[in-house]
């Protein structure tokens, strides 16, 4: 059991995929060092979260300044106020309040409460308990004027993370620096019409990388798209269901159901050699099993040469030192865009819920203001 559960503590809690704790820890150490904070990480294999220990004031600084969307391996992040031991205690809500009360000046009146668990089979068995416990806890927090009577989207959120049945970690996050989804998990249903499960990666990517209020403008019917390495059509399916006209590039066969829509043109060609005849492509997507540096260079060249406006693609991860590798891939892309490009750009990367041994990257030119 980690030290943070057994004792007092402040810091940052980060949730990640089980098995990627070391990568999440390496990333938070690197990013906080850039902020001038030098804490230390504590985690265990397969526990699906990392605790970064630092002073309370430093945790507050990180919670405000380190953007969740700039972290690749962290799904959710909150500033830790302290651990709670609830084993054998009937009034668990009071124990949570004891941790929160001394720090109320930090977060003021919270606008929402999130009770959850790390994403492990053992912890997920507590999901039903978390839903039930949320009701009396919410009432108790409102009575103590720690939580607003109605959800307030612009106020901080309180977090109670049950790491096992006996212990929880309590903290807060700011409204501008949190995920819409509990645990950062975007749960999606697999469509019967989709040719492969890989379709869920692109579906999630659109939801994570494109803000909901920009979907109508940036992801809509009638757009032109290209899918490199498309067969059998898992990613093409997501473009088709959004009403796009797609050039699916792959020497392999495409699902007949997609070809019957009339929205797909199958081009049997090498994805690394193909280029569209016209400069009217909005979206480029790619899920090819290739060397990450090679894929990154290809995607960057499409943007630089005006062959697309936005790109979503996967980069396969090595078995070891994954964060160092990812940083190298992304730095290479940034350097190429900064050196050869003439416009401001945005790059986002995330180890999505539906990703396994890969990360998903989004690139786009930013509109000139």
From Swiss-Prot:
Gene Ontology terms, MF aspect = S-adenosylmethionine-dependent methyltransferase activity
Q: Where in the cell is it found?
A: Cytoplasm
UniProt KW keywords: Cytoplasm, Methyltransferase, rRNA processing, S-adenosyl-L-methionine, Transferase
Q: What class of enzyme is it?
A: transferase
The catalytic activity of this protein is classed by the Enzyme Commission as: 2.1.1.186
Q: How does it assemble?
A: Monomer.
- Assigned protein family: Belongs to the class I-like SAM-binding methyltransferase superfamily. RNA methyltransferase RlmE family. RlmM subfamily.
- The protein's name: Ribosomal RNA large subunit methyltransferase M
Please name the gene that encodes this protein: rlmM
